[in-house]
Amino acid sequence: MSATTRTPATPGTPGTPGSLAMEVARVQNSALAEFKKPTAMVRHKNKPKILTEEKYIEEMSKIIQRDFFPDLERLRAQNDYLDAESRRDFVQMAEIRERYSLGRISGTGRSTSRRNNAMSPATFETPVSQAKCSNTPLPNSRATDTPFSTDGSEKSDAEGRDTTAKLSLDAFLQKYTSEDNQSFQEIIETAEAKLRQKYAVLYNHEKLSAEQLQRALMLPSIETQFEEPDPLRKIETWNYTNMNSIMYVPDGVEYTEEERVQLAERKQSIQHNATRLPDEAKHREMDTKKLNDEVPQNGAGGATATPKVRGFDLLRSPSPRPGEAFSPIMTWGEIDGTPFRLDGGDTPLRPTQGPSFRINENSRRENIAIALAERVSERMRNQKQMALDTARRNIGSPLIRTNMERLASMSPAAQLLATGKLGIRGTPRLRHTPSPMSGRKRKVTPGVVRSTNTPILGEPKPKQQAKISTPAKNVTIDTGSTLTDDLLKIPTKRRTAADFF
């Protein structure tokens, strides 16, 4: 009988029980190493839907008109009717009456045809059609009911109902936004990100402090427990915050669980019946009914009502003076004085010692100052008007002005310069006649042509020599010189120091 020797199986041999056990242990260790703490469910904030600016304003206007101004359509119809009546546009008046006065809903207690009362714009209601009768605000509906908006075409009506039919104003603003609002929000987020990046030392340190505290609270593994302690694993009693309580206003106490539940239950809402005035007709009916209910119980002066016999009230004995208990509607007498306006000093003082409002009269100094200011302003207005008239006359006149007119139109400084420096006189210049001892006699003939006009400023005056032409002879006569010769020959170039040496 031969004995067989069995060799022990090595753990590395595949398919053996030992290798399978080691493989299972390795998988468990890897799974344990990769184990992570489950995080809380992250709630993704729903981004609002972006609408165009025109669509956003249009839909929001529909909601505001529907919830807060349901009578706006009727008021517009009344204004159109009154405008057509003032223009005597009978065609438009008939169209408005047909649109707003004939359509009525059955079951509301009103007739479907009110031709007799159609002339009054006060009876206008919102037009009702058979296709949209369910979406039109009813005149007798309660104030808390939310009517639906109406559009002209079926397509726009369907889009309007899809967007704003079942949404309030707050819900619409949370669900939709405009392009401008979205762009502004992106600008704000970009600016905040740049601010955090610029002051990263302040913002990141708060995050690092929270991570360090979490790391200190964690239990180290078995392998690292006998190593040197981590210097960062130190528990700090104070949490680091950027907005500390010393430099900023401290935060309040956190809400308890009960307070959080109460805040969650309290939802913000708008009472639409408080945003509009109640119907006066209903209030009148209620007041009349209430008054009728109270009259049998309380008579005049608080006395009890008279008893009834077989359904008839007992009458009181007539009073010799029937109007004694009532204040008269009209009276007679003499007027003590004619009413007049009370000035500031005549205002009666209040009998109480409390503060009272009183306008003081202007002082004498203030009245004088006001009078002087008015006088100066009137003078300035007159001067300004005269200057404007002169400038307008000078610009618009095609005539050539004389030296006197030109000198009068100048400013005082220009007049002083013209008379003092340039030698221009305001009066007509006197031409000096030549003396008998000065040369030859002048022969005056009918053929002499001489210019008597004064030369214009800025033009050089030619020499005073005139050629006398006669049919018989050509004789040249010297007319002499005057005091104004070469007066206006002002050098155009300013002299320098070298010109005098």
From Swiss-Prot:
Cellular location(s): Nucleus
GO biological process: mRNA splicing, via spliceosome; nervous system development
Record InterPro entries: Nuclear_protein_DGCR14_ESS-2
Keywords in alphabetical order: Nucleus, Phosphoprotein
Residues modified as Phosphoserine: S409, S411
Presence of the UniProt keyword Nucleus in the record: yes
Coiled coil location: none
Gene Ontology cellular component annotations, sorted alphabetically: catalytic step 2 spliceosome; nucleus
Keyword set includes Transport: no
Biased composition (Low complexity): 1-18, 105-115
Region entry Disordered, spans: 1-20, 105-163, 425-471
UniProt biased composition (Polar residues): 126-151
Comp. bias intervals (Basic and acidic residues): 152-163
Protein family membership: Belongs to the ESS2 family.
Protein name: Splicing factor ESS-2 homolog
Source organism of this protein record: Drosophila melanogaster
GN (gene name): Es2
